[in-house]
Curated annotation (Swiss-Prot):
The gene is glgC. This is Glucose-1-phosphate adenylyltransferase. PROSITE patterns: ADP_GLC_PYROPHOSPH_1 (PS00808), ADP_GLC_PYROPHOSPH_2 (PS00809). It comes from the Bacteria. The keyword Nucleotidyltransferase applies. The lineage of its organism: Bacteria, Pseudomonadati, Gemmatimonadota, Gemmatimonadia, Gemmatimonadales.
Amino acid sequence: MTPSNRGTLARTAMAYVLAGGRGSRLYELTDPRAKPAVYFGGKTRIIDFALSNAINSGIRRIGVATQYKAHSLIRHLQRGWNFMRPERNESFDILPASQRVSETQWYDGTADAVYQNGDIIADYAPEYMVILAGDHVYKMDYELMLQQHVNQNADVTVGVLEVPQREASGFGVMHVDANDRIITFLEKPDDPPGIPGAPHLSLASMGIYVFRTTYLFELLRADAADPHSSHDFGKDIIPTVVRHGKAIAHRFSTSCVRSQDESLAYWRDVGTIDAYWEANIDLTTVTPQLDLFDKDWPIWTYSELTAPAKFVHNEEGRRGHALNSLVSGGCIVSGSYLHKSLLFTGVRVHSYSHLEGAVVQPYVDIGRAARLRNVVVDRGVRIPAGLVVGEDPVLDARRFRRSARGTVLITQPMIDRL
C-alpha cells in the first residue's frame, strides 16, 4: 500500500502525539528517557512509528506533547523531524509541559496535555484532530480513519483492535453495535468483557482518537472545569462522548498498512521487557511480522552519519560473522558470532564473544569472550570480558533485571556493581 496521495482530509488535520509517558514496566530502560524515546528496530525510536504514520498518511501539521525525562526525546525530534517547512503549510511543534494554562501544574492527564496547548492549536486552525499515543509500534493510514469519521458523522472515532480477553485489562474496552457505534466503554477494567460470539477476545482501544477540533475543545473546556475529572481521554473524555454523543469504533484491520509479506495486522505495545525483546528479535526472522524494508511506507527517523558495519577476522574460533541478525551502521563485529541478534548503531563486539537473542542498544562495547543470551543491553554499556549472561537464571536474577520469562536487562549501573 502506498502513502495517501488524496490528502483531502489529512491536509485539514493535525496529529497530536502524546509522548510524556514513563513506561514504568520497562524498569531501568526508561530511567534516563521517556518510553517513546526508547530505541527500537536497529535505528529508530518508538515514537517514529506514530510520526511516520502521520507523514505517510498526508498529515502535515504535527504536535508532540512531552513531559517525563524529555531531553533524549526532544533531542531526537529536533535532529530527525526538523524537515517540516512553514512555507509549505507544514508545522512540527515540540510541546513540553510549560504551565501555559496554570502556573502551578504540569500536564495533569492526557486530555490536559491537549487542552494546555489550545492556543497553539488554534493558530493552525485544523478542522480535525488526530490524537495519537507515542509509545506503540504499528503502521496505519490515518486518512482512512478520518474518512470513516466524516462518513459516519461521528463525534469521536476510536481506533480499536481485538486482543485476548485475558490481556485486555490494560486497555480501554468497549462494546459496539452492528454499525460499530460504541455502546459502552470501560477504561482498564479488572474483568474485561469479551466480544459477543468470541468471549476469548475483547475489543480494545488503541489510544487513537479523531475529533472535529471545535467539538474536542468544547469537551476539553468542560473537562478542565470539572474538579472531579482525572483529565484523561480514556477515563473521562471518551466515556462522556459515548453517553452523550456519537462514538464510532474504527477497526485497525481496515487501515493497517501491510506489505506483501505481512498477512496479519501488526500492532505492539512494547511496554514490558519481554514484549520489547520479542518484538525486536522478531525482526531478525526471514519474514518478520513487521516489515521495516517496506519502501512504500518508510519509518522516518534521525540517522547518524556512520561508517558501514564491519566484520573482521576469519580463523577457526575467531570468525566475525552474523546469522539471522540485524547489524546497524558503525558496528564492528571482531572475531565473534551473532545469531538472532540486533545491534544498534556503533556497537563493538570483541573477539571470541557469542551473542544469541541479544538486543544491543547504541554504542555498547562487548568485551572479549563474553557470552550473552536473551538479553537487552542499554545504551553505552561496557560489558566486561568474559561476562556470561543467560545461562544461570539464579545468578542472572541476582546481578541484573531478569523477567519471569527469562529476558535479562543489563544497564551500566548493574555492571558497575559486579
